[in-house]
């Protein structure tokens, strides 16, 4: 005697339906992919970026509620942006800023200060301005990295930022509670920024990573975006650092 089993289709509501997500640095790469993922989950999007033309294309592509072109590392412009935001924001992701590589002993100290200030001050300024804008249970998500955990010539500034951001994140999570604060630490991600940094060496780097990474493929912006949206929707997550590097930190890659 056989028993027929009927499998019914269970509809799932979008996890960010009706929620407002701000992506600072949302015109390309990880930021734009996160915006796409959040849009699929029903979020209303507000994007920022430096390039007006690129930002306009990105905002149109994800049907953003609004967009604002400015330099997020400029405290005055950042403060004005937050002042103009609606009072009810659910999530903010910050992907602005870029890595800096160079030998410490050859580095102009004034430039080194600017690079460090760009990373730390940006996150602190975002947190300060967002404190009265983000709903309880919402989250700030910052982007960091895993590559600087392994010492190497030319990685001095990157390493300093890498090890400091988790502590900054944890302390902000306590200060801003019940708003949640989390950090995503990525390794190599196959973005336009990576292509611009590597130039003709990009394909060699991809091949090297495919051979050495435990996952046997290169991490894509969609991988990071999936993690970002998970952090937004899981309200138990705060003060933590989440690695998404395909195991890069465990191998010589």
Task: Identify the residue ranges that each predicted region occupies.
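Rossmann-fold cofactor-recognition segment
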Residues: 61-76
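Substrate-binding pocket helix/loop in short-chain dehydrogenase/reductase
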Residues: 103-104, 111-116, 205, 209
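Catalytic loop of short-chain dehydrogenase/reductase
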Residues: 115-116, 122-125, 139-177, 188-189
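Conserved glycine-rich cofactor-binding loop
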Residues: 27-28
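Conserved NAD(P)H cofactor-binding loop of Rossmann-fold oxidoreductase domains
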Residues: 93-102, 246-247
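A glycine/serine/threonine-rich, flexible loop-to-helix segment
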Residues: 189-212, 253
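Conserved Rossmann-fold SDR core element
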Residues: 166, 175-190, 194, 237-244
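C-terminal substrate-recognition "lid" of short-chain dehydrogenase/reductases
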Residues: 217-244, 249
């Amino acid at each position: 005697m056989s028993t027929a089993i009927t499998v019914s289709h269970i509809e799932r509501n979008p996890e960010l339906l009706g929620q407002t997500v701000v992506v600072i640095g949302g015109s390309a790469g990880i930021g734009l992919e996160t915006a796409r993922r959040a849009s699929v989950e029903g979020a209303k999007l507000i994007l920022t970026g430096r390039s007006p033309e690129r930002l306009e294309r990105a905002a149109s592509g994800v049907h953003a509620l609004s967009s604002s072109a400015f330099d997020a590392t400029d405290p005055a412009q950042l403060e004005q942006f937050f002042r103009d935001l609606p009072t009810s924001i659910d999530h903010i992701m910050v992907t602005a800023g870029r890595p800096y590589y160079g030998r410490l002993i050859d580095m102009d100290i004034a430039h080194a200060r600017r690079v460090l200030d760009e990373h730390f001050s940006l996150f602190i300024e975002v947190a300060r301005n967002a404190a009265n804008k983000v709903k309880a249970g919402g989250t700030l998500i910052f982007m960091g990295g895993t590559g600087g955990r392994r010492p190497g010539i030319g990685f001095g500034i990157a390493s300093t930022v890498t090890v400091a951001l988790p502590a900054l994140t944890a302390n902000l999570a306590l200060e801003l509670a019940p708003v949640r604060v989390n950090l995503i630490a990525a390794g190599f991600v196959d973005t336009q920024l990576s292509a611009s940094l590597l130039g003709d060496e990009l394909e060699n780097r991809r091949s090297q990573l495919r051979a050495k990474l435990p996952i046997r493929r290169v991490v894509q912006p969609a991988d990071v975006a999936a993690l970002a949206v998970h952090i937004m929707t899981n309200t138990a997550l705060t003060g933590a650092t989440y690695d998404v590097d395909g195991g890069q930190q465990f191998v010589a890659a």
